């Protein structure tokens, strides 16, 4: 256990200077890497592998026509080849995958990585970021943490902020000093997140609709238009209705389905190349892109909105990085996905080079290039592959919503873990049904691949542009590379993506308005929730009660201490929340052991159990008042209430036993009390300095029913060693136990609800009398039960506020609060043990 020292509650571990975790960068065995590469084909590449279903159809929708010179089809193939080569292969596989945040990827991972290397966080403090206020202690790497890292010789902890040369230092200072730039950074991350959510609506629609559209070549045209949309909607409804069962039961089929699909389209491509046009490889020359744009001009530029669909799903390589590793994703793409897609697109182009006559029922698309004898089996495989690709996008949307909720940027929703083995497999009921309704509405409303492609393309390219912008900052701030390299990265890839973005945006009235509207709605929800949460925290910060107020409570004020443990939730990691003073003022009593619990969702993926709990003491030890800060990463799974209660009590017991409490008391007594106006602040500073990291598992707590009986007398040693005469310790073969006394025989009318004993580590020294007395009182309180005091705040705009603030706070934020779930820690708390304290916050 670490000794009491200035500990930053927002920085549980030292970030790697490159953003990756050492555990993730360890080289895995070759067999395991290949197994992960195989699995990634079904999870990561389902969406990307189904893009040949609709790319040519979207590119030749109306903007350009297929002529006998083949310049159009060869130009489109050239654009497809170089887009696949430059964006997924060069940008993502070679560069972006290296910018992981402790093994995790995605837009928020890049944002969290940047915030840890510069004081640029504007996330709600209870949800993973500093409030951004001057002097706020909730920063990722404060001066105290830097001193501690330097004292421990940990250069890596300082490398995130201290090194990097003039360019990194200059960019860091620019971000830290200008709130506008910090807001721009947060807005970029939120825009990318909103577009990912929009992609979760559009990708299932276009993938399933395009797969089902193969029926147009197998039936009459007047019959097809009445069959295509109902079948697509039926498949989509089944897909969303099965989400709550999870994917672990059928997940083993995902990789074989995608592999079968990739082999199928690549073999069809080879057949078409050999049979129709072996010289189609000429289109791999960039010269054909120039010829294409020169001939088609504005029509060719607008057709780029359909061509960019060839890279839809590329962002999943980075977003799903946490489930695999960098090498496995690179192997799967370069060895299987990339060559299969190139062969598929070349095969379609080879077929179209020899088929120029456009009949009344003829459309350029994937299925026209499939030999008629195998068209039905290919149709079945295509539908299965589209379902797999859609499933991956839906799961990714759930994961993104979970990250936003954990970081305080989205209203709380119900998160169901569908697998006991894989923590990333989650299901969010509210989001699932919203996605289904929107997906069905778009499918029924558009009924056309062209409009669906325009909508999906804009969402895809916007996310990629956001990644490019954030990645250029990572190159400077986190990798400490030259600023010219960062400029080169953003200019090269930004120019390519801006070209596609402009081609998509110009089709606003033809479907591209959908992702913009969806992003605006989700962006408004996120901004309103973020604004209301920040204002609520600022009210807590400004109205918190000094520790001296709590220490001044004396028996003559009528304060009563009752048996048990009182667990008071607060979003503050220092001081006393205003809601507790409100509670004590109206009900002058609190428990014999009081724990102020602060749950922090920090902007890193995972917090190790050894660094999860921070424990400190408030006031003299006779008060039995503690503060506990529990830190979770945005991918951590919250435990159930019973397990959490045990770990919480054990962390306090370990704090008492290990000597950290004695060291904290000595540190407190050695400092003179400040009785001037700044005494409260000084006391809070001293208290924060006494916070200690408590590793889990040092002390185990055993609980038995009250009637289980006392241990035998020969197992009990030193029964009165505690000074109070109530505790006993038992020596075993490998551990020492401190037990509560046996329940008394018949005069006792009400037996304790449970008997508690702490099992100490085998090598631990015998605790002294003061420690035993404090542990004994903690055991007595645990036996009496634990009560949860939860604040229920109503946020209202204060009088004199502007109309806009009253609209946002009194109506929009209040509506979101009333329709969101309660905090995660409160979901499984027994209602009989919960006391809610209501208070109105005027902000």
Curated annotation (Swiss-Prot):
Domain of life: Eukaryota
Side of membrane Cytoplasmic, spans: 1-34, 94-183, 247-249, 320-326, 399-425, 473-482, 532-843
Membrane topology, from the record: Multi-pass membrane protein
Transmembrane segments: 35-55, 73-93, 184-204, 226-246, 250-270, 299-319, 327-347, 378-398, 426-446, 452-472, 483-505, 511-531
GO MF annotations in UniProt: potassium ion transmembrane transporter activity
Similarity-based family: Belongs to the HAK/KUP transporter (TC 2.A.72.3) family.
Stated name of the protein: Potassium transporter 10
